[in-house]
Amino acid sequence: MARYRRSRTRSRSPRSRRRRRRSGRRRSPRRRRRYGSARRSRRSVGGRRRRYGSRRRRRRRY
């Protein structure tokens, strides 16, 4: 999804550069927060649930 959106912004006029920078700044903190929460839950959870969580995480990414 991210690659497709980047290619779209490139095809647009120079205005896309401004939008791209704004979206990048807003998205980076959101992504960091999601990764942090996922890592914390993984550590607290046991081995069996760990494998199940990884499968769910992969489905979300794709």
UniProtKB/Swiss-Prot annotation:
What Gene Ontology terms for biological process does this UniProt record contain?
chromosome condensation; sperm DNA condensation
Organs and tissues of expression: Testis.
- Transmembrane among keywords: no
Which cysteines share a disulfide bond? none
Please give the residue positions where the record annotates the modification Phosphothreonine.
9
Q: Where is this region: Disordered?
A: 1-62
The reply to whether Transferase figures as a keyword in the UniProt entry is no
Top-level taxon of origin: Eukaryota
Q: What is its main location?
A: nucleus
Give the matching InterPro entries: Protamine_P1
- Which spans of this chain does the record mark as coiled coil? none
Which cellular compartments is it found in?
Nucleus; Chromosome
GO MF assignments: DNA binding
Keyword annotations: Chromosome, Developmental protein, Differentiation, DNA condensation, DNA-binding, Nucleosome core, Nucleus, Phosphoprotein, Spermatogenesis
Alphabetical GO CC annotations of the entry are: nucleosome; nucleus
Q: Which family does it belong to?
A: Belongs to the protamine P1 family.
The UniProt function text for this chain reads: Protamines substitute for histones in the chromatin of sperm during the haploid phase of spermatogenesis. They compact sperm DNA into a highly condensed, stable and inactive complex.
Output this protein's name. Answer: Sperm histone
